[in-house]
């Protein structure tokens, strides 16, 4: 029996559901949500996903799609989820140097000296090796686009604190060359297309 998987449609609880051998989705994470299956204070991002995504069969002990990395509860923006372990590892490993762009709103004015320090590298309290921004572009006097290729705990907030400023709002707008679509509302999700996945490939 031959099946055309590309055009296969399933019905889950009466709702038509396209077949995907592996799930790759993006979520516009809203503020006040946790990237955890067992949240401690705020609602879980997984409650924003439909049951078929949360309960997809998986070889690991945990069912369903998993977040590729994490965003703090107050951070908004582009979040990837998948049930492909190799994809999750490739996208979250610091060795792969996948660029991630954050729109940062600061409490104090951003000056050229602060930008220079972020680009040159700052030392965080848990690592003597300086961490630096791959790019830092001032949008206005209290807003900048910061590009990182690694993901330490609270990294953006700690980097801004290290140069004498403070993060007031944080939004991830891009991973690789994949941008968060302007029409994807907070709390909504969509399947990644083949073109989207190519935009997540490492930059040569």
What are these regions (language model features)?
Residues 1-204:
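Basic, flexible Lys/Arg- and Gly-enriched helix-loop patches that mediate nucleic-acid binding at interfaces
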């Amino acid at each position: 029996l031959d099946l055309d998987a590309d055009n296969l449609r399933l019905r889950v609880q009466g709702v038509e559901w396209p077949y995907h051998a592996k799930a790759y989705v993006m979520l516009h994470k809203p503020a006040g949500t946790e990237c955890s299956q067992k949240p401690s204070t705020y609602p879980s991002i997984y409650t924003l996903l439909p049951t078929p995504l949360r309960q997809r069969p998986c070889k690991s002990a945990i069912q369903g799609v998993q977040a590729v990395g994490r965003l703090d509860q107050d951070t908004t923006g582009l979040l990837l989820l998948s049930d492909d372990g190799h994809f999750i590892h490739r996208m979250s490993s610091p060795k792969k140097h996948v660029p991630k762009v954050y729109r940062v709103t600061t409490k104090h004015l951003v000056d050229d000296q602060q930008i220079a320090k972020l680009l040159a590298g700052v030392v965080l309290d848990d690592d003597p090796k300086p961490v630096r921004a791959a790019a830092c572009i001032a949008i206005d006097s209290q807003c900048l686009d910061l590009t990182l290729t690694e993901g330490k705990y609270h990294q953006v907030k700690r980097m801004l604190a290290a140069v004498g400023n403070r993060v007031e709002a944080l939004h991830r707008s891009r991973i690789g060359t994949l941008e968060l679509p302007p029409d994807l509302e907070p709390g909504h999700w969509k399947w990644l297309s083949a073109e989207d996945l190519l935009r997540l490939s490492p930059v040569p």
